[in-house]
Amino acid sequence: MNKEDKNQYLLPLPCWMARFIKNLHVTPQGLVIKPGKNDRLIWDGSFIPNWQATCINMMLSTDTEPEIIYGETFMKHLESIWNLRITHPVTDILLFDDDVKGAFRHNKYHPDIAAAFSFIIANLLYIPLGGTFGSITSPSNFEPIARARIHLANFLSNRTDLLQKYKHIIDKVKFSEEPDSNTVFVQAVKDSIHKGVQDTKKTIYNMFVDDSLFAQIRSVMPHSMAASIEALYIILGFPDVQIRQDPLSLDKYFESICSFQRIQLGISLNTRTMSLRLTEKKRLSMLEELSHWHKKRKSFTLLQGVILCGSLEFWANSSPWVRFLYHQLRSSVNLSLCNCVQITKNRKDIKKSMTELANTKGLESNELKQRFLLKKVAKDTYKCQAKAYINKSMGNELKMMINILSHPKHFNLETPIAHVITRDPDFITYGDACLEAGGGYSENIFWWHEEWPEAIKALTIKNLTVSRKCKESNKLVSINLLEFVVEILNYAAITVLFKENPTLCAHSFPLLLNWTDNMTSKSWIRKAAKKTKKGKALQRILCSIMINNPVGLKAEHIAGKKNILADLISRIYKSPHSKFTFKNLFQDFPQMKSWNRFHPSQELLSFLYSGLLTGQDQGLCPPKHLGYFDLHRNIL
């Protein structure tokens, strides 16, 4: 608190003055302590001791506040790196970031409302003079400052005179060594979205709350740093320790290295390999966390499961295929959540409150009571100590993730920036499925067709009569599953194609865009299946193909009436009722005669059909062969 007072973030008064402050509220204070970071005071503006109470956050609204846009920051930062590489294909690109000290505190409260944010610690009453960490409007209120800074810094970034002005700061920054003649720079390519840097003398800045992220070539980087510092001082005031704290956090300038490889927002970026990955510190931390989930462990609490899932989701931000590794863990945590909610609601005090709530339905006080009760149930749910048990499938998943994190050289944990940013795809495929067969193609390159085995046809809705509550419904092979198989086969075909013909793409990490007319199968490319066991099994197969694969994958939806050729290919099957034949197909689409046909390997098909029939997890066992192209065209 002495530090807060020294920085003039608050006004300390004798605690007896609290009796004269009309709008004083009970607001708990907390302290967030993280190793390697400064401790942060937290102001809990959502606390209410009972349902009649009104907390400060209930009096505030974000509807009239500036829109928060920092969620897009990291993607924009990656795109700026991509454009820099287009313009500077063989020049080192350096990364840096600086932040604002006491960011939210720079937004000052009006004197008429400042007292409402007061709190008492020991024998002193503290009145915050600026935004608090815990108010729902603090992030929104800082947005104008953040946006003003990046625009002003961009405007100033072509000025060379600023470097001398801040030489005393920038000279203390350590820079990585220059690349030697053997250094390889992974390339980026122009497209309709990214055309390179328009003004090479200017720098693009992206703010994530109070962190300003930027990238630039080595010769320009010092000027970019100077412009960032100048913009901050113009907006928040130049250093004057007798009046206020220096708004610039100098830790980044004095204690970190400006390099081609840097940890930004918790993710390791590398501009030479044009990739992002889990940091080594985080990898070891996750291994330490997973070591407590050893094979002899039998159970876990809801909070323990949620914390683990949170760590894995963070990992998935840098390796998208990770989301397909812990289906059972996610299901077990969700089941534990439902169980803990039920246990909490069955407590006597909660039941009593719920009865009172039902009796006051329609009254003005009902909404306040309901909000208070829901908050209490949610809070107590995560404190519930009811045990959830680790089954065999979950144990296998934990073992699998430990194995992957323990062998980073065998399992590539890097993801190319080319697979993350929004850009024009290098390959485009179309696919479709019916209950009899599936097919797909990439225009002017290849096509493929597979008729489903009779065992699978027998389990489709066409031949299996089920209802939602029927046990037989678990055996059902839905059209969603068949459409997802088509997407996997399209991905396998492009993987084989690029491996055999790497010159088809202008860079090392192509992106496949697969068009599908099924929304569920589209979502399964980036989101884990929640309910269907067979969908989870298929996602595990896709995961095994994606690991160490230079080809990226994304899916988009196309209207069924526009997906004509893929639909016709999938409608060809052996049946007296089928009106379509390959002969008719080639007559209607003569261009297909010059395309190669892709044949999925029997090993890959066996994996996929096993997933459709049994839903059993195959583990991470990627097929040794995905398939081949028949160069003898027109052979069916």
Locate the predicted segments by residue.
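Catalytic-core region of right-hand nucleic acid polymerases
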Residues: 5-157, 269, 277, 281-328, ...
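A short, polar/acidic, helix/strand-boundary loop motif
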Residues: 123-148, 183-188, 445-485, 520-529, ...
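RNase H catalytic domain
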Residues: 206, 492-564
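C-terminal reverse transcriptase regions that engage the nucleic-acid substrate
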Residues: 127, 258-418
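Flexible, glycine/threonine-enriched loop-and-boundary segments that flank and lead into catalytic domains
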Residues: 16-18, 182-196, 402-435
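Inter-domain linker/hinge segments that demarcate the starts of reverse transcriptase
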Residues: 1-20, 74-83, 144-158, 221-242, ...
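C-terminal functional segments of enzyme domains
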Residues: 263, 268-272, 550-604
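Polymerase palm active-site segment centered on the conserved acidic dipeptide of motif C
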Residues: 68-75, 97, 161-176, 185-200, ...
